Amino acid sequence: MDAKLLEILVCPICKGPLVYKKEAGELVCKGDRLAFPVRDDIPVMLESDARELAADEDA
């Protein structure tokens, strides 16, 4: 994923920062505990496609 894109992307819900989890292929919002998928190097920033992080899962 492009580093410049990562710098400008924010969570579409809370506008907070995102952390790229390359091994999982996800952008994670720690504030909302949501993980947005990255498909073919394209982030899918739709709330309906995000998954909630489990209580024991590290954000």
UniProtKB/Swiss-Prot annotation:
GO cellular component: cytosol
SUPFAM superfamilies according to UniProt: Trm112p-like
InterPro entries in UniProt: Trm112-like (IPR005651)
Tree of life domain: Bacteria
HAMAP family membership: UPF0434 (MF_01187)
Family named by the database record: Belongs to the UPF0434 family.
Name recorded for this polypeptide: UPF0434 protein LHK_01103
Protein species of origin: Laribacter hongkongensis (strain HLHK9)
